[in-house]
């Protein structure tokens, strides 16, 4: 649970969100998620059975009291915009509450879209200034976590910082994937390295490095000044991690905020939970984390709800098929509109409107919305993208060589499939993981099966006619 040192601190923390605007960077492509982001931005990817990834950042804002939010979009934004319009339009504009969509519009140049995270904010400065906020919270729209931003705002104000960066320890072997910082005993940042090849360890903890979570708080006027300076700096990549934050360390105005101070947990014994789901393996594991008996991320905490767009769907249904086999599930999440008939689902996540027909086994897999699984299929360690139809009798996840020839095989060794009709299967094999199953491939396999049956039927008809003609001629 988030704790405050005194009543005065608590009162100040409750006031600060009213002076704050949150900006969610939601324009990223997320290319490491392969075909999951072929037709949608990474923050719009489905997660946890019924949510989109961006719902976590949006819910954290509302639960923290920050009710003025800008969502900066760019790549494949239609699905994301549609989701926000349908699920996040309940805020009261008369009370100056809003979720404002900020698409890329080439405001500063007719030749460039957003060149970096800082440029994405800079190109919207005319709008952001009109929000008239004292503090700007900048968030990534593609992380899974629960955090009270009011606690971080309090830390920012009490330290007199111009900028505060949320941080979390990560294994030193993973440090090259993050922005890594060095800090003093009171968490003033003295050095910042964006994705260093050799990340410096935390003093006294050589197995971990201190990583940026991509969450920043700025004093608004100071941020505007920084962005204008950066925009006029030749050679800048216009990125917070690469340019803005490293520059501030020399000025001694930037501080780190440990995530464990503001992480929201319903059980004090649970460790702080934050996941960057930027790869297929990380995405698969984070989803299955929620299906654990005691998940580290508590989605049942009514004090900190994760909101989303709710479709009017009937409850999930588990039925006995005509042979007497019972539909059943264990250690799984099953969403509304799903029907499991005479099959077994183990340690998996079924998203809305999934249909699993008889005699199937689904193990450690993610079935995204509208997936249809034919009879007698076995799926293990798979991600099946939206609207895929798995042909009857298909087996995925049991033979590495066959899977790699048909589907994308993740770095961890599993596989995935997408809902596009044109695209090549690529992949590499490693010890663990899952399969990403592509719809275009399934269509081809299904067509081959049907073509095979069609050819056999026609051959049978031709042979029958041939023998009939032969017998007629023989009788004459």
UniProtKB/Swiss-Prot annotation:
Binding annotation for alpha-D-glucose 1-phosphate: 114, 179, 194-195, 212
Keyword set, alphabetical order: ATP-binding, Carbohydrate metabolism, Glycogen biosynthesis, Glycogen metabolism, Nucleotide-binding, Nucleotidyltransferase, Transferase
The EC number(s) this enzyme carries: 2.7.7.27
ATP-binding keyword on record: yes
Tree of life domain: Bacteria
GO biological process: glycogen biosynthetic process
Keyword Cell cycle: no
Major enzyme class: transferase
Pfam families for this protein: Hexapep_GlmU, NTP_transferase
Involved pathway(s): Glycan biosynthesis; glycogen biosynthesis
Single GO MF annotation: glucose-1-phosphate adenylyltransferase activity
InterPro entries from the UniProt entry: ADP-Glc_PPase (IPR011831), ADP_Glu_pyroP_CS (IPR005836), GlgC_bac (IPR023049), GlmU/GlgC-like_hexapep (IPR056818), NTP_transferase_dom (IPR005835), Nucleotide-diphossugar_trans (IPR029044), Trimer_LpxA-like_sf (IPR011004)
Reactions catalysed: alpha-D-glucose 1-phosphate + ATP + H(+) = ADP-alpha-D-glucose + diphosphate
Family classification: Belongs to the bacterial/plant glucose-1-phosphate adenylyltransferase family.
Classification via HAMAP family: GlgC
Subunit structure: Homotetramer.
NCBIfam families: glgC, PRK00725.1, PRK00844.1
Function of the molecule: Involved in the biosynthesis of ADP-glucose, a building block required for the elongation reactions to produce glycogen. Catalyzes the reaction between ATP and alpha-D-glucose 1-phosphate (G1P) to produce pyrophosphate and ADP-Glc.
Descriptive protein name: Glucose-1-phosphate adenylyltransferase
Native source organism of the sequence: Yersinia pestis
